[in-house]
């Protein structure tokens, strides 16, 4: 055998060995894939879908829910009977291909099986999700119905146990309970006949009616109690109180109280219709209106009762208060009479006291009448209170006026004493100012001073005449005092001004000697200033002439002399 042939045989043998090994490996790999697919199929088949279907089936669904269940149930039946069988056949066929080393067909078959299992897996997920949704929806529907029934039963029990508290509303409440019961019956009929949409609408209405009626049932007792117990009790109390007040002598400004009682009775009676019709908002409003009217009547009675207390107190206190003011007026009259012996009293004060006396007499008639007729008055106490309080307020005003008059009268003698003291002071001041001027040894007295001086002197004489009159006019005296005060102030200022101007002129004339010998302007000013000083007695003009001339040659000299003078000026010693 040639070497070439040997090599060829060896190569063929090697290829056969390699091919066989590869075939064995591929078959094992496909076996593993097929085993995995078998396990996936078994896992899907063993899911509790049948149990879930039976659970939903036993819920006895109706209407659209039942239609949906049938569709999903049929889908599951198709899967469990057909799809799984197909997969089983395909697995068996793929195993045959694999065992016979037909790997291409085996691979293709395995791919198809994987796709089938993936589709079945998705379908099962959808079926189970749909079944779960049906269970949840049914549970919700059942729970909703049970909840509504529970609320309805509680409402029925509540109404039955508290029937007396609903009054006129009970009949309408029971009627609405029957209507709700009918709605439940209608719901059951529609639901059983496979019309879930309309059944749901009926259930919605029933639930709404239950909630609304529950709210009504909770509100009615309080409104009924207000209408049938509280308001009638208050009205009865008002009518009883009104009778007692009338028997006790009370009167009222309002003349329609009895008719208002009748209107309240009618209003309460009419409001029963709102209760019967369950018009609770209207019923509450009518109750509130009735309560407001009752409160208004209570306020009327309370007003008169409180006014009676005030009237009794005023009747007790006003006579003594009136007597007090009358006594004050008598004292004022006596004081005016006493002062009239010495002073002229103004007609205003005299007439004021007389007017007060006349007013007090008129007030006395009213007060005494009120005191005497207090137990038999035909007026409402609030009216009497207003009248008596007005009198009391006026008496307070009169008392204040009396105090002011008394103070004014007391000032008359004080003003007289003050005037007599001041007239002496002013006379002494006038004499002192005269001596002060004389001591200055001036060449003459300016007319401005003499005019003020003699005017002041004349005014002092006039004041003395007023004070020496048989009956002193104190108003005139006070006017003269005011005039004299201004006169003395003006005279004192004029005196200081004249003396200052004269003194400074003399000092500056003497000071100018140091400049007159060589300054013609100063010499001329000296001559003119001296002439005015000695002949015109115009010391201010004289000072102005010499000061201007000196300030030209020695600026500030006049200011220096003025400052020095003010520090050493001699004051008038009164």
UniProtKB/Swiss-Prot annotation:
TM region(s), chain numbering: 8-26
Keywords of this entry: Cell cycle, Cell division, Cell membrane, Coiled coil, Membrane, Septation, Transmembrane, Transmembrane helix
Record's subcellular location: Cell membrane
Main location: membrane
Keyword Acyltransferase appears in the UniProt entry: no
Any one GO BP annotation for this protein: division septum assembly
Record's function text: Negative regulator of FtsZ ring formation; modulates the frequency and position of FtsZ ring formation. Inhibits FtsZ ring formation at polar sites. Interacts either with FtsZ or with one of its binding partners to promote depolymerization.
Name of the protein: Septation ring formation regulator EzrA
